[in-house]
Amino acid sequence: MNIRVTEKTPGKDGDAGWLVLIYRVPPEPTRLRSTVWRRIKSLGAIYLQNSAAALPASASTERALRKLRREIIEMSGTAVLLSCSVLAGESDVHKAFQAARNDEYEEIVDRCEDFLQQVKKEYTANHFTYAELEENEVDLVKLRNWFAKVRERDVFDADGRQAVEKALEECEQSLEAYAARVYAEEAEGH
């Protein structure tokens, strides 16, 4: 399994190494747990077990996890950040990372399908205005940005990426066709 590394990373024998954050957050208020969970998810980390999250080691992931560790401590929690290598079960960790990214990719594909349905509704309702076009353009930009964030976290090149690329291409083509229709309708004064 190949790891895509964009920075020098610690480790031996070409192994990028791993960073593991083990933490405990006070049970109340519950928003603290949610904040930590969202931050860990946004970094692309996976949970090895409750309150133990792992990421491939890099300078940027180390900075992000150090920052999160400080925030947890400021929440009156405890946290330790470890740099380590996997002695056994590394393929399981890789699979867990790929599954997490594939889940995110699948969600983006679902949203792309929603986008295509929305454009189809515009045709059905005969809504060919610049306002509708702009709204759809904004939605497509959001999808592209979301994909870029997930792609950045996808250090093991999960298979689901190709499906998103195809779905986004379909969205772009659909929006281009819709835009052409809007311009034609506006030119005719409809």
Each model region followed by its residue ranges:
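Positively charged, polar, low-complexity stretches
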Residues: M1-K120, A125, N145-A148, E152, ...
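Transmembrane beta-strand segments of outer-membrane beta-barrel domains in Gram-negative
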Residues: H127-L140, A148
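Glycine-rich, aromatic-bearing surface loops/beta-hairpins
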Residues: L140-H190
